[in-house]
Amino acid sequence: MGFLSKIVDGNKKEIKRLGKLADKVLALEEDTAILTDEEIREKTKSFQKELAEIEDVKKQNDYLDKILPEAYALVREGSKRVFNMIPYKVQVMGGIAIHKGDIAEMRTGEGKTLTATMPTYLNALAGRGVHVITVNEYLSSSQSEEMAELYNYLGLTVGLNLNSKSTEEKREAYAQDITYSTNNELGFDYLRDNMVNYAEERVMRPLHFAIIDEVDSILIDEARTPLIISGEAEKSTSLYTQANVFAKMLKAEDDYNYDEKTKAVHLTEQGADKAERMFKVDNLYDVQNVEVISHINTALRAHVTLQRDVDYMVVDGEVLIVDQFTGRTMPGRRFSEGLHQAIEAKEGVAIQNESKTMASITFQNYFRMYNKLAGMTGTAKTEEEEFRNIYNMTVTQIPTNKPVQRKDNSDLIYISQKGKFDAVVEDVVEKHKKGQPVLLGTVAVETSEYISNLLKKRGVRHDVLNAKNHEREAEIVSNAGQKGAVTIATNMAGRGTDIKLGDGVEELGGLAVIGTERHESRRIDDQLRGRSGRQGDRGDSRFYLSLQDELMVRFGSERLQKMMNRLGMDDSTPIESKMVSRAVESAQKRVEGNNFDARKRILEYDEVLRKQREIIYNERNEIIDSEESSQVVNAMLRSTLQRAINHFINEEDDNPDYTPFINYVNDVFLQEGDLQDTEIKGKDSEDIFEIVWSKIEKAYAQQQETLGDQMSEFERMILLRSIDTHWTDHIDTMDQLRQGIHLRSYAQQNPLRDYQNEGHELFDIMMQNIEEDTCKYILKSVVQFEDDVEREKSKSFGEAKHVTAEDGKEKAKPQPIVKGDQVGRNDPCPCGSGKKYKNCHGKA
């Protein structure tokens, strides 16, 4: 209780502080009102000039804090002249919280878009770029078009970044003072910028300040979804088909156990025996059968934990994911780790090839790279701990401009879903008769269609808004507040929509919101309630629940069931009890806690790859930006030679065999016969290094002479190709390691620590392989340059999607044609060890 009161007190103190600063802004209203349009723009130029002379980011921020009242007053005056609207004091307070790098929680209809204009203008003055981020391209386009009028009036430029834009158009959009974009497109542009071969192909500037609209949706709900650019992997789909047939044969409890609370499913001993017989293996859990067990587990997840028309839909022979937080389908996105293919096998549609990850990043790690991050939403307080721990952001609840008049009624709980839905329909019919508009919220497509059929039977005209007819969303939502309107919507109605009341509706009680089930997240329930009672309008809300709802089943409705039976309650009699509502909220908190733990765990694992990604991208960028790559190559040649000497030469051996070392040197650095054992026999390691190094220098000089002024371009191309090839393989290897690492806990090992240690070892091996490949190709390649080749710029950046098979196939840049010796993975290792290449120096 003490912790909660501290949060409440903290919010009160912060509101008081914001209020005082907002008063300073409002006090300048008369002074700014007398300025001419040109004088306002001159103020902008003056601020920009002052900031341009300050190089240090911290000192720039101090200056922005100093000019905040004057800058915000200018935006208020500009808004008054351009839109005939002036931000209220509470909006100014929200704008100050955003400038601080925090989250402004503002209720629906309180004008978040106008609130964001003040911190956007202020921070754009620094000239480092401000990204205003929305959840979809429709909102980015409409907001940038509308707000550009204000920013242009104030003397700032605005860019719009869309998936369909070309490289040039994207670069231009990012070069503006303010750039509107979706979170997806920003993440993909970052990844693509780190896959280019030439500096001029990059589109982004360094990440400075981002303001995220619907911040909880992007940083919490989508935190576990990685952005992935991938290419097609050559893998057979037959195992998916076999695993699907096997999963269909299994019986619950006998062959597998399913935990409804955690949604975990795994084979029993009997199920494992069946699998061994079906797949003809001796020990299912043997390391060599990891692919089989992986496919079986994935097929089980597809059959047991995922439901059609709830978690995904099948449209025109294609499996589309349904976003659990918006109810929308997500074309282009695919479940990763083979789950999408398992669902395709389950549904009998064409199984698409798996994809190989070429680059990936989670939103958690992408957004933490900004110098300053802020956001706004109607619902964030319930997740404040996560925002504080992971993003170092505080949630400030901004007061409403007018008091909230919506009445939130307590939940009604029924024994069965049939009893619940019958009661819902009766409530809708009654409200519809008097003309009160009703918004019915459901958690799944199938529920919305079921209620729709019940209402049709009662002759109630209504609209249905779900993933199957989302194209009419704007039209349906615009009519939802009209007299007599009945709208059934999945969670998708909760985002980016503002339902305005029609004539005479206020007198009828405003918009009535009816929830047909509690979502596992309290925020989603709050969003549904928030559709009603905007800007001081009247309204009411109520949730109808049943003991058969998923949340109730997962978190123990047995006690309630027994109590209702003991009281002799039938299906038509509900319980209306604060105790029950508290129990539901407690269940939601547990789910939220589980989800937070899962996101935290993902971040801990992803931190390993984040550090490695940073090293690789920094190295790539240094190579691209460097005029001279010979120093990098020289360092690689020296370290590779030194490693070989450390590995092959044992000075304590009285009768050493130099053959493996000579074979390795001739294979990686020199031509056959260039190094003889007589030259190094009896020499110590330092002498051997100098002897071989002089030969390497000679070989390098010959290559330089052959290539002339093309040498630097050739080296750069080889370096980038080596890095990209091995980095892509490394991501794949790390992904495989991560998929099976949790099994280590059964052996009393710490999976995270093992992942960190083994990931570090794999990274070291990859770096060595990059160096070795670079040495070999630079010294031993026969090079021919194509005549009159112009650099071909990528025409569009619109190919990357979430985990799709076509991603990452960017047009190749003109590069030297390399004719080098290739060693097959199963060939004998050239070092002479007698091992296969993949188990020796080809190890990745």
From Swiss-Prot:
Matching CDD domains: DEXDc_SecA, SF2_C_secA
Region listing for Disordered, in residue ranges: 793-825
Catalytic activity field: ATP + H2O + cellular proteinSide 1 = ADP + phosphate + cellular proteinSide 2
Residues reported in the UniProt entry to bind Zn(2+): C829, C831, C840, H841
Entry's Gene Ontology molecular function annotations: ATP binding; metal ion binding; protein-exporting ATPase activity
EC number: 7.4.2.8
EC category name: translocase
Protein location: Cell membrane; Cytoplasm
Manner of cofactor binding, per the entry note: May bind 1 zinc ion per subunit.
A Gene Ontology biological process term: intracellular protein transmembrane transport
Keywords: ATP-binding, Cell membrane, Cytoplasm, Membrane, Metal-binding, Nucleotide-binding, Protein transport, Translocase, Translocation, Transport, Zinc
GO cellular component terms, semicolon-separated: cell envelope Sec protein transport complex; cytosol; plasma membrane
Cofactors: Zn(2+)
Basic and acidic residues bias (residue ranges): 793-813
Residues engaged in binding ATP: Q91, G109, E110, G111, K112, T113, D498
Residue ranges of coiled coil: none
UniProt main location, coarse: membrane
Membrane topology annotation: Peripheral membrane protein
Function: Part of the Sec protein translocase complex. Interacts with the SecYEG preprotein conducting channel. Has a central role in coupling the hydrolysis of ATP to the transfer of proteins into and across the cell membrane, serving as an ATP-driven molecular motor driving the stepwise translocation of polypeptide chains across the membrane.
NCBIfam families: PRK09200.1, secA
Subunit composition and interactions: Monomer and homodimer. Part of the essential Sec protein translocation apparatus which comprises SecA, SecYEG and auxiliary proteins SecDF. Other proteins may also be involved.
Family: Belongs to the SecA family.
Protein name per Swiss-Prot or TrEMBL: Protein translocase subunit SecA 1
